[in-house]
Amino acid sequence: MGDNYWIDPVNLSPQELVETLQRIDQEGYEVIVVTEGGFPMGPFRMAFRIDEEPNMYYISQKDLALEYDPLQFLHWVRQYSGEIINWTHHGRVPWWKIFQMLEAKLEDSYYYETTMFYIPSSISHDCWSLFLQFWREGFGSPPLDVAWS
């Protein structure tokens, strides 16, 4: 647990990350952060790290399912994993705060690189295994939404 699930990382400059994030519908998606850990996994659409920071930021679709709360899912992952996952906090981050942080990185003279993971949308991909288990335990079969397949 905690690997990249064979999802190849894409290295981006902070400017490229800003441009990528600006194309996302900020009303339909939110940013979730996991401090001191995290790994790319479904149902998040993207995940990224900034330079050597230990935090993982997730782009989460707000209307994925009526019953779904990404923070509840992350809490479950942490409990389910026992001692394997050691992140210290997870929570929502406002979009403006992400852009403010990235703008500060752009103004810094030190070169930063970001790592982006584009998470496969197919629920049959290995990176969805934890979510599918979480969903089955709480709600039964996974929702049959076209956006999930």
Curated annotation (Swiss-Prot):
Q: In its UniProt entry, what is this protein called? A: Protein E4.1
Q: What is the organism field in this record?
A: Snake adenovirus serotype 1
